[in-house]
C-alpha cells in the first residue's frame, strides 16, 4: 500500500472510535519499551475476521470475550483491569496477559490454541519467569487438565467462567 504510516494510524483510530476494532498493547515493565512495540488488533464483530486460519478467528473470539469481561469488572466492581500480550526479544510470545484488579489475585497469562493439547512452550517460559497463573484455552478440547503449573481448559469452560 502506498499510504503513510500516519494515515494508517489515523484510520485505526477512527475504526476504534466506531467500535469496529480494539487494540491489545504489549506488556512490558518499562513503559517506554512497550510504547515502541506494535499492538495487536482485534475485531468486535468476529464476522469481520477474514482469515482462512481458524486459529486466528478463535483467538479473536477469546480476545473479544476477555475484553468484555474486563470492562464488565471495571464498570460494575470498579476494578482496575488491563489486557496486554507479551513478546520478548527472543521471539517468545503469549497471546494475553491480563489483570482483573481483584484484591490478592495474581496477573494471568493465557494462550489460545485451536487444537493443540500439550502446554505451549512459550506459556511455560513466561509462567516461570513472571510467576503468574497460566491457562491454555483449547477450542477442540473436551476436558480440563494440568501440565505442571499450567491449566489446559476447553473453550466452552473458559468462556462460561467469564462474567459476560
Placement of each model-derived feature along the sequence:
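A cross-kingdom feature that marks ATP-driven nucleic-acid transaction machinery
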Residues: 4-14, 19-20, 24-164
Amino acid at each position: 500500500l502506498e499510504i503513510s504510516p500516519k494515515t494508517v494510524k489515523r484510520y485505526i483510530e477512527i475504526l476504534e472510535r466506531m467500535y469496529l476494532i480494539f487494540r491489545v498493547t504489549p506488556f512490558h515493565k518499562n513503559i517506554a519499551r512497550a510504547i515502541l512495540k506494535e499492538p495487536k488488533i482485534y475485531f468486535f464483530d468476529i464476522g469481520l475476521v477474514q482469515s482462512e486460519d481458524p486459529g486466528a478467528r478463535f483467538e479473536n473470539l477469546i480476545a473479544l470475550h476477555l475484553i468484555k469481561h474486563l470492562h464488565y469488572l471495571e464498570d460494575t466492581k470498579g476494578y482496575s483491569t488491563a489486557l496486554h500480550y507479551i513478546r520478548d526479544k527472543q521471539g517468545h510470545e503469549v497471546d494475553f496477559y491480563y489483570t482483573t484488579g481483584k484484591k490478592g489475585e495474581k496477573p494471568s497469562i493465557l494462550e489460545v490454541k485451536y487444537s493443540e493439547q500439550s502446554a505451549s512452550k512459550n506459556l511455560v517460559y513466561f509462567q516461570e519467569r513472571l510467576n503468574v497463573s497460566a491457562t491454555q484455552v483449547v477450542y477442540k478440547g473436551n476436558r480440563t487438565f494440568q501440565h505442571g503449573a499450567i491449566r489446559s481448559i476447553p473453550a466452552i469452560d473458559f468462556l462460561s467462567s467469564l462474567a459476560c
